[in-house]
UniProtKB/Swiss-Prot annotation:
Residues 499-598, 603-692, 697-783 form the Ig-like C2-type domain. SUPFAM superfamilies: Immunoglobulin, L domain-like, RNI-like. Keywords: Cell membrane, Cytoplasmic vesicle, Developmental protein, Disulfide bond, Glycoprotein, Immunoglobulin domain, Leucine-rich repeat, Membrane, Repeat, Signal, Transmembrane, Transmembrane helix. This is Leucine-rich repeats and immunoglobulin-like domains protein 3. Residues 1-24 form the signal peptide. InterPro entries: Cys-rich_flank_reg_C, Ig-like_dom, Ig-like_dom_sf, Ig-like_fold, Ig_I-set, Ig_sub, Ig_sub2, Leu-rich_rpt. Residues 1073-1093 are annotated as: Disordered. It is a single-pass type I membrane protein. The chain crosses the membrane at residues 810-830. It holds the Pfam family LRR_8. SMART domains: IG (SM00409), IGc2 (SM00408), LRR_SD22 (SM00365), LRR_TYP (SM00369), LRRCT (SM00082). Residues 1083-1093 have a biased composition (Basic and acidic residues). Interacts with EGFR, ERBB2 and ERBB4 (in vitro).
Length: 1119
C-alpha cells in the first residue's frame, strides 16, 4: 500500500476516534447510567445491561445474541450488533429509534438484507459484511433513501444482475463475495452519487463493455479477481476516477485504449500480474497519471515511446520484473518523474543516455541487479540526474569503481553500495559528490595496494566511518584487516594481481557471410584463475565461440599472459556492433576498448532501368533501386557523363526518397544511354537504359516555290525533321514522279535536282515525309520560263538579268567541264604545286584525322551547324586532304576508274545559291583568278562566267601547307604583253575544248572592268606531269539552306575609282576560313619586298567599281 493511501487511512481513523471519545466524554459528564448511578441524563438514556453505551453509540457486539435486546433506548444514533448470531431482525423493535443513523450487523447469520421498518429512511450507514446474503434485491434497499454507505463484503453474492435502486449511495463495498458476472448497467442508478466502489476478492473474469457509467466515481478497486485481459474502452464512463487498483488479477494483456477515458486518474496499481511489456497503446489517455505501480510482473521490455501519454508521472515502480536492459529511450519523456524503483530485476545493460531525460528524479533504486559493468567500465552512466538525492546500488556484484563512475551526481546525498564485493576503488571516485551525507559500503575483498591509499583518509574526513565496513583481501600480509587499521605506508604496489589489458581488439569491416576474429590479451602476476567474456554493445555474449590461451610472458618470469579469441562465422548485419573483452580473476576485471564491426554487402539492383521509347513532349520515367549494406547511393549519368540537357533546362527531377528519375517534356536531345550507378563502401554496380524519343515528321525549312529559266538546274528543297528520321517521297501534280536521267536526289531525298529543266518540268511537286508516328506533306511549285533573248553589249555593265543568264551558262559549263576536263586540270595543278612547295612546307603528319562525316543540315534544331573543316586521308594513304564544309556537309569529288569527275549529288545543293541572284555578291565581268591556297569552284573556270563559285575547292593545298597561312603579297610589275600571257597558258597541255574556253575567257581581259596584275610565280605553277592526288571540297561564300552567308567584310566607304597601276596590296589567308577581301587595307603604306621579275606570271584583278548599285557595295576582290 502506498504512503499517501496509508496516511489518508490513518487520518480517517484518527478523526473517528476523536469523535467517539468526544461523545463518550459528554456521556460521562452527565452520569454513568450504565452503572446505575443517579444522574438526570442517565435516567433519560437507559442502557441495556448486555450492551455498552458510549455517547450515542450502543455497542452490543460480540455478545452471541440470537435476537435484539429489548427495549432499545430511543436515543441511539449508532447501533453495533456485529459478531452475533442474528438471523432475523424485527422491524417493530426499531420503529421507535428515530435518531438511528448507523447500523452495523457484520458477521451474523443474515441471509437477506433486513427490513428495519420506518427508520430505514434515516439510515446513512448499513454494514452487513460477513453474513450469508446471496443476492441483492432492489425491494430490500428501496426504503433506505438516505443510505450513503453500504458494506456487503464477505457474503455469498454471486451475480450482479438486477440494477441497484436509485439511492444516495456514495460508498459501496462488495469485497470477498463470489461474484463471477456483472450485468451492464447494474450501477447506473448510482451514477450521480457513488464515489467509491470496491469489488476486491471476487471471481470476476471479465468486465463487460460500458459496465461502469459512473461519472462521479473516484476510486475503483478490482484487486484479487481473475481478470486476464482488459479490452479497449473497458473503463469508459469513469471520467472522474482518481485511482484504479487491479492487483493480483493475473492480467496478461492490456489492449490498446484499455484505460481510455480515465483522463483524470492519478494512481494506477497493477502489481502482481503477468504483464510483459509497457507500451503506449494501453497507457493511452492517462494524461494526469502520477503513480504507476507495476511491481511483481514479468515485464521485460519498455517500448521507446511508452510514456508519450503520461508525461506527468512522478512515481514509477518496476521492482521484481524481468528487465535486462535499460535503453536510451526507456524513460523518454518522464521529465517530472520523482521516484524510480527498478530493484530486483535482471538489468545488465544500461545505455549511455538511459537516464538523460529524468531531470527531476530524486530517488533511484537499482538494488539487486547485475549492473557491475556500469560502474566498472562506463563513464557517466548517471549523467543527467542533476537533482538525484538517493541512489541505491545494493547487491549488484560491483567489483571495482572507476574515477568517473558517478559523474553528474553533484546533488547526491545518499549512496548505498552495500552487499557488493568491491575489490578496488580508483582515486577520488566520490570526490565530486560534495553534498554526500551517507555512504554505505561493506566489503571484505579490497585490494589494498597503493591505489587504495586515499580511501581511509577520505572516509574519516567526511565522517562516514559508521556506514563503512571494509577490510583487505590482498596482499596476504593485510588480509582480513580493516582499512582503517592499516597505516598509509602499508598500501604498496609490489605486483599487479588484477589483469591488465596488453592487446586490444581492433575495429574491422567484413563482407556479409565471411568469417573473422577478435583477439584480446591481458597479463597478471597472480595465479588466480582467469575468466574470459566478450560483450557486444555492452551485453554479455552467452554462446560466443571463444579460444583461450595462457603462457609465460618471459622465461623464468612470474607474469602470465592470457589471450582470448572471439570467432564470428558467417557474419550477418545483426553481427554489427561494438565488441569488448572482459578478463577477470579474483582481484577484479579488466575491460578492453570497444572494437567496432561493420558488415558490408555489395549493392544489388532491386529495380533495374529499362529501355524506354517515348514521344517527344511526354514524360520519361526511369526506375532504379538497389540494396546493400551500408545502403548504396544512387547516381545517374547520361552517355558516360553528367551533362544532362534536361538538367540545364530544369526538366529533370530526381526524388531523394523515391527510386524514380523523371524527365519532363522530353526532347530529341534527351536521346542517349542513361546509366544508374549504385555505390557503397563495399563496391559499385551500374545498369544502362537507352532512351529513344519519337517525333512526328516536320519541315525544318519552309517550302519555297521556285522559278527557273528553261535549261537551268532546278533544286527543290524538302528539309525533314523527326525521329526516327522520316522517309521522303516526291510526287508531281498528285501523281508519281517520273524520274529521268535529268532527275537527281540528294541528302536522303531531301533535295530534288532537275538538270536542264524543261517547260514540262513545271508543276506542283509534293514532298511526303513519314515515319512510325505519322506523315507530313508539303507542296512546292516549280515554274519554268522560256529562254529569254538578250543582246547585252560586251563592254556594258551586266544587269541582274544578265547575271541570271550567266548563271545558266555556269551550270552548263560546270557540268561539261567536270565530266571532261576537271580531273586532268586538278591533277596537273596539285602535282606541280607539291613539287614547288615540298622543301618549305612543315613536316607532314598522319596523326591528325578529324572526322568530317556529319552533315550539319541534319541537326535536330533544324539549323545548320557552324562551318566545319577537317582532314581526311587521301586515297593513297600517304597524305591528307584539307576538307572544308559546305552547307550540306563535307564533300569530296568522286572519280571513277578512268579519272573522270562525277557530280556529287550532295553538293548540288549549292547550285541553288549559285542560281539565286540575291545570294551572289560578285557582279560584273570576271576573269581567271588564281592564288595558291585560295578557294575556287569545282571547275577552275566557272568563276569567270558567274562571278561567284557554287562549289568552291581549295587549289593546290597540302595539309598544314605553310603557304596557306603565310602572308601573300602583290607587287607592281610591267604589264606583259597579251602574247606572253597567252604563251604562258599555252604551255599547259589543256584539252582542246578547255583551251577554247580559256581563249574565250582571256579575250575579255581587254574590257574596261579588268586590270592586269602580276603575282609571285610561286603562287601558281603548271606542270605537264600529273600526280594522283585528291582534291578536297571546300565551303562556298554563299549560304546553303538558309545558312548565313560567309561573305567577306566589305568596306562601306570604298572608293569608286581605282588607280590604273598595280599598287602593292597584301592580305592574310587564315586556316579554315574564307579569304578576307579587305584585309589588305590594314597593311597599306607598308613596305613590301619585290621579287625578281622572272618569277612573275600573269593574272588579273577584278573590279566592280564601275557598276555599283544601291543594293551592292563596290569593292576590290583580290584572289
Amino acid at each position: 500500500m502506498s504512503a499517501p493511501s496509508l496516511r489518508a487511512r490513518a487520518a480517517g481513523l484518527g478523526l473517528l476516534l476523536c469523535a467517539v471519545l468526544g461523545r463518550a466524554g459528554r456521556s460521562d459528564s452527565g452520569g454513568r447510567g450504565e452503572l446505575g448511578q443517579p444522574s438526570g441524563v442517565a435516567a433519560e438514556r437507559p442502557c441495556p445491561t448486555t450492551c455498552r453505551c458510549l455517547g450515542d453509540l450502543l455497542d452490543c457486539s460480540r455478545k452471541r445474541l440470537a435476537r435484539l435486546p429489548e427495549p432499545l433506548p430511543s436515543w441511539v444514533a449508532r447501533l453495533d450488533l456485529s459478531h452475533n448470531r442474528l438471523s432475523f431482525i424485527k422491524a417493530s423493535s426499531m420503529s421507535h429509534l428515530q435518531s438511528l443513523r448507523e447500523v452495523k450487523l457484520n458477521n451474523n447469520e443474515l441471509e437477506t438484507i433486513p427490513n428495519l421498518g420506518p427508520v430505514s429512511a434515516n439510515i446513512t450507514l448499513l454494514s452487513l459484511a460477513g453474513n450469508r446474503i446471496v443476492e441483492i434485491l432492489p425491494e430490500h434497499l428501496k426504503e433506505f433513501q438516505s443510505l450513503e454507505t453500504l458494506d456487503l463484503s464477505s457474503n455469498n453474492i454471486s451475480e450482479l444482475q438486477t440494477a441497484f435502486p436509485a439511492l444516495q449511495l456514495k460508498y459501496l463495498y462488495l469485497n470477498s463475495n463470489r461474484v463471477t458476472s456483472m450485468e451492464p448497467g447494474y450501477f447506473d442508478n448510482l451514477a450521480n452519487t457513488l464515489l467509491v466502489l470496491k469489488l476486491n476478492r471476487n471471481r470476476i473474469s471479465a468486465i463487460p463493455p460500458k459496465m461502469f457509467k459512473l461519472p462521479q466515481l473516484q476510486h475503483l478497486e478490482l484487486n484479487r479477481n481473475k481478470i486476464k485481459n482488459v479490452d479497449g474502452l473497458t473503463f469508459q464512463g469513469l471520467g472522474a476516477l482518481k485511482s484504479l487498483k487491479m492487483q493480483r488479477n493475473g492480467v496478461t494483456k492490456l489492449m490498446d485504449g484499455a484505460f481510455w477515458g480515465l483522463s483524470n486518474m492519478e494512481i494506477l496499481q497493477l502489481d502482481h500480474n503477468n504483464l510483459t511489456e509497457i507500451t503506449k497503446g494501453w497507457l493511452y489517455g492517462l494524461l494526469m497519471l502520477q503513480e504507476l505501480h507495476l511491481s511483481q510482473n514479468a515485464i521485460n521490455r519498455i517500448s521507446p515511446d511508452a510514456w508519450e501519454f503520461c508525461q506527468k508521472l512522478s512515481e514509477l515502480d518496476l521492482t521484481f520484473n524481468h528487465l535486462s536492459r535499460l535503453d536510451d529511450s526507456s524513460f523518454l519523456g518522464l521529465s517530472l518523474l520523482n521516484t524510480l524503483h527498478i530493484g530486483n530485476n535482471r538489468v545488465s545493460y544500461i545505455a549511455d543516455c538511459a537516464f538523460r531525460g529524468l531531470s527531476s528524479l530524486k530517488t533511484l533504486d537499482l538494488k539487486n541487479n547485475e549492473i557491475s559493468w556500469t560502474i566498472e567500465d562506463m563513464n557517466g552512466a548517471f549523467s543527467g540526474l542533476d537533482k538525484l538525492r538517493r541512489l541505491i546500488l545494493q547487491g549488484n556484484r560491483i567489483r571495482s569503481i572507476t574515477k568517473k563512475a558517478f559523474t553528474g551526481l553533484d546533488a547526491l546525498e545518499h549512496l548505498d553500495l552495500s552487499d557488493n564485493a568491491i575489490m578496488s576503488l580508483q582515486g577520488n571516485a566520490f570526490s565530486q559528490m560534495k553534498k554526500l551525507q551517507q555512504l554505505h559500503l561493506n566489503t571484505s575483498s579490497l585490494l589494498c595496494d597503493c591505489q587504495l591509499k586515499w580511501l581511509p583518509q577520505w572516509v574519516a574526513e567526511n565522517n562516514f566511518q559508521s556506514f563503512v565496513n571494509a577490510s583487505c583481501a590482498h596482499p596476504q600480509l593485510l588480509k582480513g584487516r580493516s582499512i582503517f587499521a592499516v597505516s598509509p605506508d602499508g598500501f604498496v604496489c609490489d605486483d599487479f594481481p588484477k589483469p591488465q589489458i596488453t592487446v586490444q581488439p581492433e575495429t574491422q569491416s567484413a563482407i556479409k557471410g565471411s568469417n573473422l576474429s577478435f583477439i584480446c590479451s591481458a597479463a597478471s602476476s597472480s595465479d588466480s584463475p582467469m575468466t574470459f567474456a566478450w560483450k557486444k554493445d555492452n551485453e554479455l555474449l552467452h554462446d560466443a565461440e571463444m579460444e583461450n590461451y595462457a603462457h609465460l610472458r618471459a622465461q623464468g618470469g612470474e607474469v602470465m599472459e592470457y589471450t582470448t579469441i572471439l570467432r564470428l562465422r558467417e557474419v550477418e548485419f545483426a553481427s554489427e556492433g561494438k565488441y569488448q573483452c572482459v578478463i577477470s580473476n579474483h582481484f577484479g576485471s579488466s575491460y578492453s576498448v570497444k572494437a567496432k564491426l561493420t558488415v558490408n554487402m555489395l549493392p544489388s539492383f532491386t529495380k533495374t532501368p529499362m529501355d524506354l521509347t517515348i514521344r517527344a513532349g511526354a514524360m520519361a520515367r526511369l526506375e532504379c533501386a538497389a540494396v546493400g549494406h551500408p545502403a548504396p547511393q544512387i547516381a545517374w549519368q547520361k552517355d558516360g557523363g553528367t551533362d544532362f540537357p534536361a538538367a540545364r533546362e530544369r526538366r529533370m527531377h530526381v526524388m531523394p526518397e523515391d527510386d524514380v528519375f523523371f524527365i519532363v517534356d522530353v526532347k530529341i536531345e534527351d536521346i542517349g544511354v542513361y546509366s544508374c550507378t549504385a555505390q557503397n563502401s563495399a563496391g559499385s554496380i551500374s545498369a544502362n537504359a537507352t532512351l529513344t524519343v519519337l517525333e512526328t515528321p516536320s519541315f525544318l525549312r519552309p517550302l519555297l516555290d521556285r522559278t527557273v529559266t528553261k535549261g537551268e538546274t532546278a533544286v527543290l528543297q524538302c528539309i525533314a525533321g523527326g525521329s526516327p528520321p522520316p522517309k521522303l517521297n516526291w510526287t508531281k501534280d498528285d501523281s508519281p514522279l517520273v524520274v529521268t536521267e535529268r532527275h537527281f536526289f540528294a541528302a536522303g531525298n531531301q533535295l530534288l535536282i532537275i538538270v536542264d529543266s524543261d517547260v514540262s518540268d513545271a508543276g506542283k511537286y509534293t514532298c511526303e515525309m513519314s515515319n512510325t508516328l505519322g506523315t507530313e506533306r508539303g507542296n512546292v511549285r516549280l515554274s519554268v520560263i522560256p529562254t529569254p533573248t538578250c543582246d547585252s553589249p560586251q563592254m556594258t555593265a551586266p544587269s541582274l538579268d544578265d547575271d541570271g543568264w550567266a548563271t545558266v551558262g555556269v551550270v552548263i559549263i560546270a557540268v561539261v567541264c567536270c565530266v571532261v576536263g576537271t580531273s586532268l586540270v586538278w591533277v596537273v595543278i596539285i602535282y606541280h604545286t607539291r613539287r614547288r612547295n615540298e622543301d618549305c612546307s612543315i613536316t607532314n603528319t598522319d596523326e591528325t584525322n578529324l572526322p568530317a562525316d556529319i552533315p550539319s543540315y541534319l541537326s535536330s534544331q533544324g539549323t545548320l551547324a557552324d562551318r566545319q573543316d577537317g582532314y581526311v586521308s587521301s586515297e593513297s594513304g600517304s597524305h591528307h586532304q584539307f576538307v572544308t564544309s559546305s552547307g550540306a556537309g563535307f564533300f569530296l569529288p568522286q572519280h571513277d576508274s578512268s579519272g573522270t569527275c562525277h557530280i556529287d549529288n550532295s553538293s548540288e545543293a549549292d547550285v541553288e545559291a549559285a542560281t539565286d541572284l540575291f545570294l551572289c555578291p560578285f557582279l560584273g565581268s570576271t576573269g581567271p583568278m588564281y592564288l595558291k591556297g585560295n578557294v575556287y569552284g569545282s571547275d577552275p573556270f566557272e568563276t569567270y562566267h558567274t562571278g561567284c563559285s557554287p562549289d568552291p575547292r581549295t587549289v593546290l593545298m597540302d595539309h598544314y601547307e605553310p603557304s596557306y597561312i603565310k602572308k601573300k603579297e602583290c607587287y607592281p610589275c610591267s604589264h606583259p604583253s597579251e602574247e606572253s600571257c597567252e604563251r604562258s597558258f599555252s604551255n599547259i597541255s589543256w584539252p582542246s575544248h578547255v583551251r577554247k574556253l580559256l581563249n574565250t575567257s582571256y579575250s575579255h581581259n581587254e574590257g574596261p572592268g579588268m586590270k592586269n596584275l602580276c603575282l609571285n610565280k610561286s603562287s601558281l605553277d603548271f606542270s605537264a606531269n600529273p600526280e594522283p592526288a585528291s582534291v578536297a571540297s571546300s565551303n562556298s561564300f554563299m549560304g546553303t539552306f538558309g545558312k548565313a552567308l560567309r561573305r567577306p567584310h566589305l568596306d562601306a566607304y570604298s572608293s569608286f575609282g581605282q588607280p590604273s597601276d598595280c599598287q602593292p596590296r597584301a592580305f592574310y589567308l587564315k586556316a579554315h576560313s574564307s579569304p578576307d577581301l579587305d584585309s589588305g587595307s590594314e597593311e597599306d603604306g607598308k613596305e613590301r619586298t619585290d621579287f625578281q621579275e622572272e618569277n612573275h606570271i600573269c593574272t588579273f584583278k577584278q573590279t566592280l567599281e564601275n557598276y555599283r548599285t544601291p543594293n551592292f557595295q563596290s569593292y576590290d576582290l583580290d584572289t
